[in-house]
UniProtKB/Swiss-Prot annotation:
Gene Ontology annotations for the cellular component aspect, listed alphabetically: cell outer membrane
Listed name of the protein: Major fimbrium anchoring subunit FimB
Lipid-linked residues (N-palmitoyl cysteine): C23
Location (main, coarse): membrane
Length: 303
């Protein structure tokens, strides 16, 4: 075999090796084993909800043992619901950490797109003048696992479990229109306001609450004189501090409520619905508070 043929054969061998194995070395002792990663979602009652469609998209940041970002992965709703594994192979690190966040809004994705270190990863609510936009149905989770070396055979499959990071709130205020009218003439557009707060506005990538205090404006509708809010989502409070629901009229805070009539505080529970019912009719203020499963609004008797 002449030199030209030997060269061609050598090149072909290298190409074939590259096709069937990601590691081209004299032996496999330093080769990382490929593996697959899946995402699994849980609700607050530890029920597997991966296939329900609750997760619309997931961004997964991959960090090495020093906290340096080495990869960024995206999954859509169909991939998550089908439990589709992502094939991966990382040569170099001894361990990797997968930091997964589900359902971030476009603003959050843009803010985190160029993060290069885990300590710089934050999921911050959009806000104006201390009033935050309600977050999406956020989930997150972290998985740290070793990188297996010494073979090109398939390594151990891995699963990153993600959990809800927000609470839901639903508000009903009976007699709201009459209460407003009793507190002065109606002067649009800013004659009244309802604010709920306060919570931190930021999660770290590792799901620790930090940042500035913000409130939320539960823009609802007045139906038959009653205020009924949509279901809003909020970040949890620090140290189970209760939320305060503040009712304003004509620029003045007229009511500030943080507990039910029985003393139960307005504490948002991650992965649950906080129901606040306020009756402004009659001589005495009546406030009911309850916690129900996610997406389940408490039904109150009409009287």
């Amino acid at each position: 075999m002449n030199d030209a043929k030997k060269y061609i054969v050598s090149v072909l061998i290298l190409l074939v090796a590259g096709m069937f194995g990601g590691c081209i070395k004299e032996d496999y002792s330093d080769c990382p084993r490929p593996f697959r990663l899946t995402v699994r979602a849980w609700d607050a009652d530890m029920q597997d909800i991966t296939e329900t469609g609750a997760v619309q998209r997931v961004v997964i940041f991959v960090f090495d043992e020093t906290g340096r970002r080495i990869d960024r992965l995206m999954m859509d709703a169909a991939q998550v619901a089908a439990r589709k594994p992502i094939p991966l192979e990382y040569d170099g690190p001894t361990t990797v950490s997968f930091v997964a966040w589900a359902n971030p809004d476009d603003h959050m994705l843009e803010e985190t797109a160029n993060v290069q270190n885990v300590k710089d990863l934050f999921f911050r609510l959009s806000s104006t003048d201390g009033i935050a936009q309600s977050p999406g149905d956020l989930f997150s989770g972290v998985l740290t696992c070793p990188i297996e070396y010494g073979s090109i055979e398939q390594g151990t499959d891995q699963t990153v479990d993600i959990y809800r990071r927000t609470a839901q709130v639903h508000i009903i205020i009976r007699g709201y229109q009459e209460w407003l009218e009793a507190n002065g003439p109606r002067q649009l557009p800013d004659y009244a306001d309802i604010l709920l707060g306060e919570t931190p506005d930021t999660y770290t990538g590792l799901a620790e609450l930090i940042g500035n205090a913000v409130q939320y404006r539960p823009d609802g509708q007045i139906q038959n004189g009653d205020f009924i809010s949509p279901i809003i989502r909020v970040y949890p409070t620090l140290d189970t501090t209760p939320l305060h629901l503040k009712l304003y009229a004509y620029g003045q805070e007229l009511l500030n409520i943080s507990t039910g009539s029985d003393g139960v505080p307005f504490i948002p529970v991650i992965g649950k619905m906080l129901n606040i019912y306020i009756d402004l009719r009659g001589a005495n203020l009546n406030v009911l508070v309850s916690v129900t499963p996610w997406d389940v609004v408490q039904q109150y008797a009409e009287y």
